[in-house]
Regions:
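Intrinsically disordered, low-complexity Ser/Thr/Pro-rich tracts
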Residues: 1-100, 108-113, 117-120, 126-128, ...
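Terminal, low-complexity interaction segments
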Residues: 560-594
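Juxtacatalytic substrate-recognition/specificity segment
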Residues: 159-290, 298-323
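Extracellular carbohydrate recognition and processing domains
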Residues: 525-574, 660-664
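Extracellular beta-strand-rich recognition modules
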Residues: 495-503, 580-587, 680
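Acidic/His/Gly-enriched intrinsically disordered linker/tail segments
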Residues: 231-243, 260, 264, 279-345, ...
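Beta/coil-rich, acidic/histidine-enriched accessory regions frequently appended to metallopeptidases
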Residues: 21-22, 28, 32-57, 61, ...
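Extracellular beta-rich ligand/substrate-recognition surface
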Residues: 172, 470-481, 505, 555-564
Length: 700
């Protein structure tokens, strides 16, 4: 997803409107009861794919386990034992990293004061409500995700209600009665329902007005049905592209107020607006999971996202892709996981608590919640494995019902089909699985032996430090990490900063900066270097930023090209003769984050006197005088953890789920007797990384 906004992709949005739709007679849309089945069928809608090739969805009869009906009894075996590293040292390494990588939320106002030179930046643009009337014409900033361009449109206020202000871009033809009816459904049904479930939007907000602005316009190039952008919720002095309103944009070329899909997108985007207020640095996967669940609980239960995931379960739940075609499966994973959490653990009352606990970045919040019902759930890996099993079994009668999506007479079918495992034969299979992704294997009938040999470590970002250690910025959405060191430049006649760096940062949206402060950290000036840019298409570059992929100028992270280590040099002679603070920053906006920034071999020396240096740090000796907030000193690897489950059918037809622990070498052995059958579920569960885990299966 190549933008700072949270959006719903048109590539899989159902019922996208055509030009003819826009002038069709007004439909009187009404919502069904919040948790009941939608009043429309999936077959009634078409899939809009503007300039894209959609991921093919599974066709034919939904797959069910061939032996599920044979289960006369079931047992829950060994689930208290997780497949975690055997040594406390390895566990402590992950825990220490998790503690270090607590990146604070991105405060755009504070950043404008510190880095943007806006010393009088305010959090609000006005304190009294907007003085607007139907018929008023305003200009708005709009971003095209296809062209990566921000531009202005002129729009007319067509509806002003107690909750919503509906603007329509000039030149678009939308039936007035249809627009007003959609606005009233939002005000009377979607607005209160979504607030009840997820919390409140910022009120009165940047514009001093309790009402939400909804701009209906065109998005050149397509690719988006609607978006919420947090930059609109700050004054234009903070971001020059801000519309200074709590608002979202609706792409009328994709969704029409006459169709239910328009209301579906409103439910989706309104949750994003609420989520931003309740938890500023929420992880995108959890945020999008809540928005797709908001669609469900507002009565719009569709399965396109979910079907894409079930066709490709080796998709990392806890990550995202900025490539639209790949993001489809991530939407499905997030939606399905939140359906599972909702039906088993939160109900309607517990969702906002997860948001406020920042569960997407703090998965222990999920564990603490689930353990109240099932005390054997002691890790996010265990909970994830339960969900993975539900996606292949969906059997409420097995064990205590955790391997299913509970439903009732007034509730929808949350899981439209189940995962189809890959059939394995006798022999050796080498494969990889993404962290918090899943591979499913249908094993040959017994008797047989399966030997699993999994990696014991995984790269944190896809490269290694120059020596043993380097500084890593961490990664996260809408968040900031800093690394600060005092430096005394007195006695030098010149000074140059030099360091080695590696970075992969979302192009045009996420930046790293090197800066100097001479007023004890109140304000900062960014430094220009050989690899920095002053381009700023979206108001996110505070002067001279590192951006894109190191060693590959002009390349963005969507290309698949990986970064390489480069040496950066920055002039400090303007600051000689005084003490300064040196600070590295990494600042990410909403919606997507790449692996981040590595720093190594930091030196500040005279460029005229040999060996006259005031700072030399190869990061090997420890933290020293560095103050890290969100940065961590890393060796480039983490222990690889595994969750293996065996869905076992005995010769007598009894079905059970068994945990298969791995040893300290990442190995496990499984034996099936005569006439025994099984499905092996393989999940990698190392946090903080998006690098896949490798393993080998040997069947004999």
């Amino acid at each position: 997803m190549h933008k700072y906004i949270l959006l719903l992709l048109t590539v899989i949005l159902l019922n996208a409107c055509s030009a003819a739709d826009m002038q069709s007679p007004a439909l009187q849309p009404t919502l069904p009861p919040p948790t009941s089945m939608p009043t429309r069928s999936e077959a009634a809608f078409t899939t809009a794919i503007p300039d894209k090739t959609a991921i093919p969805l599974p066709a034919g009869t939904p797959f069910r386990l061939p032996y599920s009906e044979l289960a006369a009894t079931a047992e829950l075996a060994d689930l208290a034992t997780s497949a975690q590293p055997d040594t406390e040292i390895e566990v402590d390494k992950v825990a220490a990293l998790s503690a270090a990588l607590q990146r604070p939320p991105r405060d755009q106002v504070e950043l404008a004061r510190a880095l943007g030179g806006v010393t009088d930046a305010s959090a609000v643009a006005r304190t009294t409500p907007l003085d607007v009337q139907v018929g008023d014409v305003e200009q708005f900033w709009v971003t095209s995700t296809a062209t990566n361009r921000t531009y202005t449109v002129t729009a007319e206020l067509r509806y002003a209600g107690p909750v919503a202000l509906m603007y329509v871009e000039q030149g678009l033809i939308i039936d007035q009665a249809t627009l007003e009816q959609a606005a009233r459904v939002f005000e009377e049904q979607i607005y209160p329902r979504t607030r009840e479930l997820f919390g409140s939007e910022l009120q009165p907000g940047v514009d001093g007005d309790l009402r939400i602005t909804i701009l209906n316009g065109r998005s050149p190039g397509g690719g988006v049905a609607g978006y919420f952008s947090s930059r609109d919720s700050v004054p234009s002095s903070v971001n020059r592209f801000s519309n200074e309103r709590e608002m979202f944009f609706m792409n009328i070329e994709s969704v029409n107020p006459a169709n239910p899909s328009y209301l579906q997108v409103l439910a989706h985007e309104f949750q994003h607006m609420i989520h931003w207020n309740e938890q500023r640095n929420a992880a995108i996967w959890f945020n999008e999971g809540c928005s797709t669940l908001s669609e469900d609980l507002n009565g719009f239960v569709t399965h396109s996202f979910v079907m894409a995931y079930l066709a490709n379960p080796n998709t990392q739940l806890t990550a995202w892709s900025e490539v639209p075609e790949r993001a489809i499966a991530h939407y499905g994973a997030a939606n399905l996981f939140m359906r599972y959490i909702y039906t088993h653990y939160t109900g309607e009352e517990g969702l906002v608590d997860l948001i406020r606990a920042n569960a997407g970045n703090n998965p222990d919040a999920f564990v603490e919640l689930a353990a109240r019902t099932r005390p054997d759930i002691t890790s996010f890996g265990t909970l994830f494995a339960d969900w993975a099993l539900a996606n292949v079994l969906n059997d409420p009668h097995l064990a205590d019902g955790r391997y299913s999506y509970p439903t009732g007479p007034d509730e929808p079918e949350w899981l439209p089909t189940t995962v189809k495992p890959r059939l394995l034969n006798i022999g050796t299979t080498d494969n990889t699985v993404y962290q918090f992704g899943v591979n499913y294997y249908a094993l040959p009938d017994g008797p047989l032996t399966v030997e699993f040999d999994g990696a014991t470590s995984v790269s944190l970002v896809g490269t290694e430090p120059h020596g043993t250690y380097a500084w890593w910025s961490g990664r996260g959405d809408n968040s900031v990490s800093t690394l600060t060191h005092p430096v005394n430049l007195e006695g030098l006649d010149s000074a140059v900063l030099q360091f080695d760096t590696w970075y992969e940062l979302e192009k045009h949206y996420d930046y790293a900066f090197v800066s100097v402060s001479v007023d004890d950290g109140t304000t900062w000036q960014t430094l220009a270097g050989m690899h920095t840019t002053n381009e700023d298409p979206h108001g996110a570059n505070y002067g001279n930023g590192l951006n894109g992929v190191s060693g590959a100028p002009g390349v963005d992270t969507r290309s698949g090209i990986r970064g390489s280590w480069v040496t950066e040099t920055m002039e400090l002679s303007a600051y000689i003769g005084q003490p300064i603070l040196l600070r590295f920053w990494q600042i990410s906006d909403d919606a997507f984050n790449a692996p981040g920034l590595l720093i190594d071999n930091i030196r500040i020396c005279s460029n005229t006197v040999a060996d006259q240096c005031v700072l030399e740090d190869d990061v090997e000796a420890g933290y020293g005088d560095w103050q890290a907030e969100g940065f961590a000193r890393i060796d480039g690897e983490l222990p690889q953890t595994w969750e293996l489950r065996l869905i076992h059918t005995g010769a007598d037809g009894d079905l059970s789920v068994r945990n298969i622990p791995t040893d300290s070498a990442g190995q496990a052995t499984i034996r099936l007797g005569t006439n025994e059958r099984a499905i092996l579920v393989v999940a990698a569960t190392t946090p903080h990384t998006t690098e896949p885990a490798s393993y080998q299966l040997r069947i004999q």
